[in-house]
Amino acid sequence: MIKIVGDGGLAREMRQLVQVVLGESCELLSPAAEAATTEWGKTVLGLGHANVRLAVYARLQGVADFQTIIHPGADVGDTTVIGHGSVITSGVVTTTDVVIGDGVLLNLNVTVGHDSVLGDCCVVNPGATISGGVRVGAGVLIGTGANIIEGLTIGDGAVVGAGSVVTKNVPPGITVVGIPAKAMLKP
């Protein structure tokens, strides 16, 4: 039985993916159930918040046996390197010499261009496009339908809002939104 950390919508999607790809049954773990779990075994992250995903991955590393899952409907380039515990869903396309870190989620219909590097536990939501040569830091959240043009760097812990078009580097910890994407002002 595979343990899925999380019990929301994404966790339920991960359960379906595990059943399709691995043919195994799953147990969804709420935060309380996760805290009470002492024996881990095979585990998949069902968490969509990149910062939470990064913290849980770090906490369970060496205890849980994180599974790397690639949907058969994904088109993963033969020179793409995929880290431990990453999940690649249906419709994802990676081209040549892409490096995907540990615990990464590439959700439905994401495209990642040549020579891009995605840091640990980043979450790339449905329909996002990452052009060639992009560096995405650890714990980055890229919103649904966002576009990042070639050669840019998205710093650790940054957030790219849904539908945004990123045309400049994004510093660590900053949230950007809009077309072109600009830093959100703090309240």
Regions found by a protein language model. Name each.
Residues 1-72, 181:
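Terminal amphipathic alpha-helical/low-complexity segments used for targeting or macromolecular assembly
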Residues 68-184:
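Structural signal for interior beta-strand "rungs" in well-ordered beta-sheet cores
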